[in-house]
Amino acid sequence: MSNYFSMEAFDYDDIQLVPNKCIIKSRSEADTGVKFGSRTFKIPVVPANMESVIDEDLAIWLAEHGYYYVMHRFYPEKRADFIKMMHDKGLFASISVGIKDSEYDFIDYLAKENIIPEYTTIDVAHGHSDYVIKMIKYIKEKLPDTFLTAGNIATPEAVRELENAGADATKVGVGPGRACITKLKTGFGTGGWQLAALRMCSKAARKPLIADGGIRHNGDIAKSVRFGASMVMIGSLFAGHEESPGNLITIDGKRYKQYWGSASEVQKGAYRNVEGKQMLVPYRGSIKDTLREMQEDLQSSISYAGGKDLSAIRVVDYVIVKSSIFDGDK
């Protein structure tokens, strides 16, 4: 067994970052930009590539306004047209693929027709797999110019293997999200220790990591950056917006949006190998306001870290407080 697992396990609510001396007059001076692949984005945040979180219209808006996105893979026949549409608009294309045999034909088609997405994500629940490694090598052979993210994984060994196979970034997180019940159905996952898993993986990583799942508050973004994330993928916090694809539902005068996991019965259309669930999340208005709030909160985090950009957060001290950060707030 790896000695990484002798480390103390902790999650977002167990950690507080320790402030340093502030060197900027206003948080507006703090730069939240992050380089990911060949592009620089406004903040290190990306909506989850789930059908209940992102659709084509939202992908267009995000790309137009300087945010990273990953389009989901649940309408595979539309992906090539999506890439062409984004390129016709002068925008970058970012798609998801799986590992089924038909996906190899799809990659061949993209290569043959020279329809090259700037970003590709291999989206598999258990990404530490021979079949994922095979797909990484195939995509890098056929589409060498695409920036390839692979996942999801939970261990340093998985990071090393996927990076060595050719992945340009790795997605960390097995079942910590609100709509995922992998930990309950299988007994496996990073639920309850997602932040510690990110820390372990960052010690092995030579390339960017995406922290995927378990984000409940904006401050968790800064904590993810502290423990090694270049990007933070978020589902439930983005699912309740006007632009979100889920249906708007009113119950007792309160508005909600539908949100479901990618391995849920809703997504699969059958009760078979279900590791996700459906839920309602409070309606939150426009996603523009949430993204602006996330950026402002992250600017405040940078000011507390004693720096001018995200690099300051990566080196701050932290304390483990064992879920006491909400004491006095309830």
UniProtKB/Swiss-Prot annotation:
InterPro entries linked: Aldolase_TIM, GMP_reductase, GuaC_type_2, IMP_DH/GMP_Rdtase_CS, IMP_DH_GMPRt
Catalytic machinery residues: 180
Catalysed reaction equations from the record: IMP + NH4(+) + NADP(+) = GMP + NADPH + 2 H(+)
Tagged with keyword Iron: no
GO BP, sorted A to Z: purine nucleotide metabolic process
SMART domains recorded: IMPDH
GO MF term list: GMP reductase activity
Pfam families to which the protein is assigned, alphabetical: IMPDH (PF00478)
Keywords per UniProt: NADP, Oxidoreductase
HAMAP family, A to Z: GMP_reduct_type2
Family annotation (NCBIfam families): GMP_reduct_2 (TIGR01306), PRK05458.1 (NF003966)
Protein family: Belongs to the IMPDH/GMPR family. GuaC type 2 subfamily.
Protein function: Catalyzes the irreversible NADPH-dependent deamination of GMP to IMP. It functions in the conversion of nucleobase, nucleoside and nucleotide derivatives of G to A nucleotides, and in maintaining the intracellular balance of A and G nucleotides.
Name of the protein in question: GMP reductase
Lineage: Bacteria, Bacillati, Bacillota, Bacilli, Lactobacillales
